[in-house]
From Swiss-Prot:
Gene name tied to this protein: nuoK
Catalytic activity: a quinone + NADH + 5 H(+)(in) = a quinol + NAD(+) + 4 H(+)(out)
Alphabetical GO biological process terms: ATP synthesis coupled electron transport
Family: Belongs to the complex I subunit 4L family.
Database matches in NCBIfam families: PRK05715.1-2 (NF004320), PRK05715.1-3 (NF004321), PRK05715.1-5 (NF004323)
Protein name as it appears in the record: NADH-quinone oxidoreductase subunit K
Domain of life according to the entry: Bacteria
Organism: Azorhizobium caulinodans (strain ATCC 43989 / DSM 5975 / JCM 20966 / LMG 6465 / NBRC 14845 / NCIMB 13405 / ORS 571)
Length: 102
């Protein structure tokens, strides 16, 4: 049995669905929301690499590396903001973050 494009797309669709459900079903914990966003970006990267490999060019793989770099920076900045927020408020609940609005 050969692993084809449909297998990669199925795995990516499952990861994308898990990430989307994680965002919509969990409205209390910011860390879980950030992890769900990372799952969505991982699904996008799997699609980019799969399409790139099956078409025979490297543009999708280079773009996937760019997306990985941006996702790592986004996660680092998001976690740094959460650490500072936790030090100030003592909680990282979404309701407390909504209280920061102007």
């Amino acid at each position: 049995m050969e692993i084809g494009l449909s297998h990669y797309l199925t795995v990516a669709a499952i990861l994308f669905t898990m990430g989307t459900l994680g965002i919509f079903l969990n409205r209390k914990n910011v860390i879980v929301i950030l992890m769900s966003v990372e799952l969505i970006l991982l699904a996008v990267n799997i699609n980019l690499v799969a399409f790139s490999a099956f078409q025979g060019n490297l543009v999708g793989q280079v773009f996937a590396l760019l997306v990985l770099t941006v996702a790592a920076a986004e996660a680092a900045i998001g976690l740094a903001i959460l650490v500072v927020f936790f030090r100030n408020r003592g909680s990282i609940a979404v309701e407390d973050i909504n209280a920061m609005k102007g």
